[in-house]
UniProtKB/Swiss-Prot annotation:
Species this protein is from: Escherichia coli O139:H28 (strain E24377A / ETEC)
EC number assigned by the record: 6.3.2.2
Description of how the protein assembles with itself and partners: Homodimer.
InterPro entries: GCL_type2/YbdK_subfam, GCS2, Gln_synth/guanido_kin_cat_dom, YbdK
Reactions it catalyzes: L-cysteine + L-glutamate + ATP = gamma-L-glutamyl-L-cysteine + ADP + phosphate + H(+)
Role according to the record: ATP-dependent carboxylate-amine ligase which exhibits weak glutamate--cysteine ligase activity.
GO MF annotation terms: ATP binding; glutamate-cysteine ligase activity
Residue stretches in coiled coil: none
Protein name: Putative glutamate--cysteine ligase 2
UniProt entry keywords in alphabetical sequence: ATP-binding, Ligase, Nucleotide-binding
EC class: ligase
GO annotation (BP), single: modified amino acid biosynthetic process
Annotated gene: ybdK
Family in the record: Belongs to the glutamate--cysteine ligase type 2 family. YbdK subfamily.
Length: 372
């Protein structure tokens, strides 16, 4: 399928996607009943969309195009109410978190969807292992060239986005020692990590044409980059965050990305170059492994900075943009999080350290989501 032309969209508008866990009480393992839930709610959703993701234990909540995070929060809140009621009617529960702490990937059923079945044929068991749960944020752009500039700018802050949203310390019944283990699942995919370097939309079109020669890439949706342009929506899509435990934190993360995008495209503070990516995977690893306690390294100077310190600097820089976008409350909440040193991954570990079981942890996450 050829790459579509870049659809011009209103700059800085938002679209947010949350991949949620569908679980079976009282054992709180992943369910395989998302299709049943979707059928139950599809005619009751008035704004946004509830749809499938890769496997039958995943449920995706997606907003419509929103002008700001308050509109997005309203849509999510309405969807959440409908989904929770349907889940209760079917003796299921819903929660966030980037991974389910003890599910077995071998048990996961790939959705009966042509695209997902084709992906299963291409990638085999890797697709079942990709039963992990992330937050994706789309930001509108006026042109393809703006999208490429924005993608490179946002890529500088991938460690910050990962650290602030880290919520996947447990996987397959084990403490991984990572704050965010979810991104590691995609490391075996040939398109993992950052997008290959291009400097404008014309070069991106040539890149996509080259990738399509492999026959594994039929559309932009088949690419698993950390950040990717979405020409059919006219957006740049940030894909590195774990699904938070609360709707409020998901909205705050979207506000952060919207405000950062506004700052990048209005101030144009960077002259991007391929060398910017030399230490990308090392800095990304620091955020995944240590969260905000990680250290990032500047590829141009060799300077090493605590991620906590650099995140506070970012929040300060984008504060005026956040005000213009109506996202100041999000930036203030994230600032409090960084200063406190708390994140969801550590809260999960604290629960287990205090004697809680992994089953109890999932139950707690369901209570948190339902009570938010």
């Amino acid at each position: 399928m050829p790459l579509p032309d870049f659809h011009v969209s209103e700059p800085f508008t938002l679209g947010i996607e949350l991949e949620m866990q569908v679980v079976n009480p009282p054992g709180y393992d992943l369910s395989q009943d998302s299709s049943m839930l979707i059928d139950a709610v599809k005619n009751k959703i008035t704004a946004g969309e509830v749809k499938h993701d890769i496997t039958e234990s995943m449920l995706e909540l997606a907003t419509d195009v929103c002008r700001d995070i308050n509109q997005a929060a309203g849509q999510f809140s309405a969807m959440q109410k409908v989904v929770l009621q349907a889940a209760a009617d079917h003796h299921l529960e819903i929660c966030g978190g980037g991974t389910h702490p003890f599910q077995k990937w071998q048990r996961q059923e790939v959705c009966d969807n042509e695209r997902y079945q084709r992906t299963l044929e291409n990638f085999g068991y890797l697709i079942q292992q990709a039963t992990v749960f992330g937050q994706h944020v789309h930001v509108g752009c006026a042109s393809g060239d703006d999208a490429i500039y924005l993608l490179h700018g946002l890529s500088r802050f991938v460690p910050h986005f990962i650290a602030l949203s880290a919520a996947s310390p447990y996987m397959q019944g084990t403490d991984t020692r990572f704050a965010s283990s979810r991104p590691n699942i995609f490391s075996a995919f040939p398109d993992n990590g950052p997008m290959p370097w291009v400097s404008n939309w014309q070069q991106f079109e040539a890149l996509f044409r080259c990738l399509s020669y492999t026959t594994m890439i039929d559309s932009i949706k088949d690419l698993h980059w950390d950040i990717r342009p979405s020409p059919h929506f006219g957006t740049v899509e940030v894909r590195v965050m774990d699904t938070p435990l609360t709707l409020s934190h998901a909205v705050n993360m979207a506000g952060l990305i919207q405000a950062t995008a506004h700052w990048l495209l209005t101030e144009r503070p960077f002259k991007h170059q391929e060398k910017d990516y030399l230490l990308y995977k090392f800095n990304r690893f620091q955020a995944c492994r240590y969260g905000l306690e990680g250290v990032i390294t500047d590829p141009h100077t060799g300077d090493r900075r605590p991620l906590t310190e650099d995140t506070l600097r970012l929040l300060e820089k984008i504060a005026p943009s956040a005000h213009k976008m109506g996202a100041s409350s999000a930036i203030e909440a994230l600032h409090r999080q960084v200063v406190s040193g708390l994140n969801e991954a550590q809260l999960m570990r604290d629960f287990v350290a205090d004697g809680g079981s992994l089953i109890g942890l999932v139950k707690k996450h369901c209570e948190i989501w339902a009570g938010d």
